[in-house]
């Protein structure tokens, strides 16, 4: 399927699974190349497991099946330098960024409420 974002490049955080993966895949199906970012490791203060590197790899595989390009990066959205590096890698590959989907997000619910 090719659609209204044909030839665009999307930078998607939280892309390893869940809504982030869903956005990345839909944008790819509609013609966008993807720069996919996720932390891919657990955070001590969060009481549930975060995405794993394998989850981000699966997102890449699914995007590639659409025929679109993807650059992945394990990066913590709380660290500007990590995001900058991921963005620069994506721009080096695709030349630009047209769309940003800031989907990374967690709920800090460790222990009893």
Q: Residue spans of the language-model regions?
A:
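Rossmann-fold scaffold of SDR-type NAD(P)-dependent oxidoreductases
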Residues: 13, 74, 97-105
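Glycine-rich phosphate-binding loop and adjoining beta1-alpha1-beta2 segment
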Residues: 38-62
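Active-site loop/turn elements of alpha/beta-hydrolase fold enzymes
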Residues: 39, 77, 106
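Conserved mid-core segment of classical short-chain dehydrogenase/reductases
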Residues: 50-57, 84, 107-113
């Amino acid at each position: 399927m090719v659609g209204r974002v044909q030839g665009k490049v999307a930078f998607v955080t939280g892309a390893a699974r869940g809504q982030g993966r869903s956005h990345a895949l839909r944008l790819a199906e509609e013609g966008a190349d993807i720069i996919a970012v996720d932390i891919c490791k657990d955070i001590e203060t969060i009481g549930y497991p975060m995405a794993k590197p394998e989850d981000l790899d699966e997102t890449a595989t699914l995007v590639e099946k659409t025929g679109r390009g993807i650059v992945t990066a394990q990066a913590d959205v709380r660290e500007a330098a990590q995001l900058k590096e991921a963005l620069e890698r994506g721009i080096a590959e695709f030349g630009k960024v047209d769309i940003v989907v800031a989907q990374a997000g967690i709920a800090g619910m460790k222990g009893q409420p």
